[in-house]
Design a protein with these regions (language model features):
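N-terminal alpha-helical transmembrane segments of multi-pass membrane transport
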Residues: 2-121, 131-138, 149, 497-538
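Alpha-helical membrane segments and immediately flanking helix-loop junctions
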Residues: 100-133, 159-162, 168-184, 318-364
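Flexible loop linkers connecting adjacent transmembrane helices
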Residues: 79-107, 129-131, 135-139, 153-195, ...
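Helix-loop-helix module between adjacent transmembrane segments
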Residues: 73-74, 115-116, 145-172, 181-222, ...
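Membrane-interface loop-to-helix entry segments
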Residues: 65-68, 72-89, 200, 204, ...
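Extracellular/periplasmic helix-exit of transmembrane alpha-helices
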Residues: 156-164, 168, 286-303, 316-317, ...
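Membrane-embedded translocation segments of transport machinery
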Residues: 261-272, 277-345, 408
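Extracellular loop-to-transmembrane helix junctions
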Residues: 55-83, 132-172, 367-373, 417, ...
């Protein structure tokens, strides 16, 4: 069973979806670059996405590592993703915020900034692959993995705020670069601990920077161009050829550049509007299909539950469904990778645990809601294309085109859905590029220092690669950056294990504050950070 090892696409989807320059000078450049990176990407990918045998079925060890961490933290923190859900929603609404709290953006803006980096093509294409390879039962295991990932996200994002750096200009920097450097040195006093912390932080910065340029940038630009080209007639349409791809790439670069120049405040303002918009567009499409087939919903849920524990018709049976579901969810919500704390650390708060609580909503939105809606839509539609794809994979191991599977489900009710899908892909891609531009900028600053010149140099490089990604595919480069990002999970989770007691103390400190008269009488604030009009006291 091939692992699903692209954050925003499955193995085999890159050739099916991303079509760079096919001939001429650009095609030659692409071939040469891919030839250089291919052996590196293959070797690193074989290690990072290597499989261990589970009842005779291959299970990517990096997925097992991520899922195990989620399970351990769930027990250690007493199922905080369940017990703390109501409090997380209160914090998100600004219930425990003050206007003068240190930071740059509100809890809501931090959440939408991070969600925009995780919700992407994986929720459209990746889920289509998962339910084709793992059957409807893979949906159940996706949800379970998402619930476990909520706790990992709580831990890493609390640490992101706890160890963030405050700069003289009022900005902050947080994430694995900070909590690995400071936290490891704190937990392991002495020169060895300080050295280890610096090395781990530098490695984290390099890994985040590389993926930010690859999967978080070039791949998104490429998919946007391909989707726009397909919906306008493909090779016979007005946007066929490298020239149109170049123009679209420049337009994307201008849009992203305009947003990221404003920093995290600008990113927060944009994502706080863009993320709800793209969620509404996509979820509405799912709901329309579900409502048109409302009588089939009980049977669909029955198929999901029975498939989870019987694995009927799935290669590998129950274990096969479990592996595919866990893999898709782990690679979709990024819980434990260390990327999301960069966005969450910019929040305005005096209590790091507040943002950890808000952050645990992220895997819930990404996996439990969006991925489940996609899977339910596919299962309910039960298209011939999906059934043929399942049979073809079971018989021949044929690569699955996840976008086609998902799109076919929508087309049963909405023949014009490719247009909606194009809008969703563009929104997902732009929001992902914006967020990963910020992640990469923080990694760049950690490696090369903070200055206006350095910042502008990075932004120029990032936007240039948007244009390059729109025209060229560089499949091997993207595979390499994917492997690098998930390698970060190895060192990040080691850091989370070491620093889990710090998170427990921060949670206790916040809960103690909640019992104080000052906190109980706190004037509620809305998502914008300002007091809600209905709650203002005379």
């Amino acid at each position: 069973m091939p692992p699903i090892h692209h954050l925003h696409a499955a193995p085999g989807e890159l050739p099916a979806l991303a079509q760079g320059a096919q001939s001429g000078f650009l095609g030659t450049v692409e071939e040469k670059i891919n030839a250089i990176f291919d052996p590196i990407a293959t070797g690193l990918g074989d290690f990072v996405f290597g499989e261990v045998s589970l009842f005779g079925i291959g299970f990517p060890w990096i997925v097992a590592w991520l899922v195990l961490a989620g399970a351990v933290f769930t027990v250690y923190f007493g199922f905080i993703q369940v017990r703390g859900l109501r409090l997380a929603l209160q914090v998100l609404r600004g219930r425990h915020s003050r206007k003068g709290d240190p930071g740059e953006i509100t809890h809501f803006q931090a959440l939408t900034s991070a969600v925009s980096g995780t919700v992407g093509l994986g929720n459209i294409a990746g889920v289509g692959v998962a339910v084709t390879i793992g059957g409807a039962g893979a949906t159940f295991w996706m949800v379970l993995c998402g619930l476990l990932g909520m706790c990992s996200k709580f831990v890493e994002c609390t640490l992101g705020v706890r160890y963030r750096d405050h700069h003289p200009d009022g900005t902050v920097s947080g994430g694995p670069m900070q909590y690995l450097r400071k936290g490891v040195a704190e937990r392991l006093p002495g020169p060895a601990g300080r050295f280890l912390g610096r090395v781990l932080a530098a490695l984290a910065a390099v890994m985040i920077l590389l993926f930010g340029i690859g999967g978080g940038n070039m791949f998104q630009a490429n998919q946007t161009v391909i989707q726009i080209r397909d919906v306008t007639g493909g090779d016979d349409g007005p946007l066929a050829g490298d020239g149109s791809a170049l123009v679209l790439g420049v337009l994307l670069a201008l849009v992203v550049g305009f947003v990221i120049i404003g920093g995290i405040r600008s990113i927060g303002r944009v994502t706080s509007r863009l993320v709800p918009a793209m969620a509404i567009v996509y979820v509405t499409g799912c709901l329309i299909v579900i409502l048109f087939n409302i009588t089939d919903v009980p049977a669909a849920f029955g198929e999901i539950l029975s498939g989870a524990f019987t694995g009927e018709g799935v290669v590998g049976g129950t274990i096969g469904a479990l592996i595919v579901g866990f893999t898709r969810a782990a690679f979709s919500n990024e819980a434990g990778l260390g990327s999301a704390p960069i966005a969450h650390s910019a929040v305005k708060t005096r209590y790091p645990a507040t943002e950890g609580l808000v952050a645990l909503l992220e895997p819930f939105i990404d996996t439990v809601v969006v991925c489940t809606m996609t899977a339910l839509t596919i299962v309910i539609a039960d298209t011939r294309l999906w059934n043929d794809a399942k049979a073809d994979y079971a018989a021949n191991g044929t690569t699955v085109d996840g976008v086609t599977v998902t799109s076919s489900a929508f087309e049963t009710v909405l023949p014009w859905f490719p247009v909606v899908l194009t809008v969703a892909v563009v929104l997902f891609a732009v929001s992902t590029m914006i967020t990963w531009a910020y992640y990469g900028q923080k990694a760049w600053a950690h490696l090369f220092g903070r200055s206006k010149l350095s910042e502008r140099a990075y932004q120029t490089v990032f936007c240039t690669f948007i244009v390059i990604g729109a025209v060229l595919t560089f499949g091997s480069v993207l595979a390499f950056t994917d492997a690098v990002l998930f390698l970060l999970a190895l060192i990040n989770i080691i850091g989370l294990y070491l620093l889990a007691p710090v998170v427990k103390r921060e949670l206790a400190r916040f809960r103690t504050a909640l019992r104080s008269p000052e906190e109980r009488d706190r004037e509620p604030a809305g998502p914008s950070g300002e007091p809600e009009a209905a709650d203002r006291r005379a």
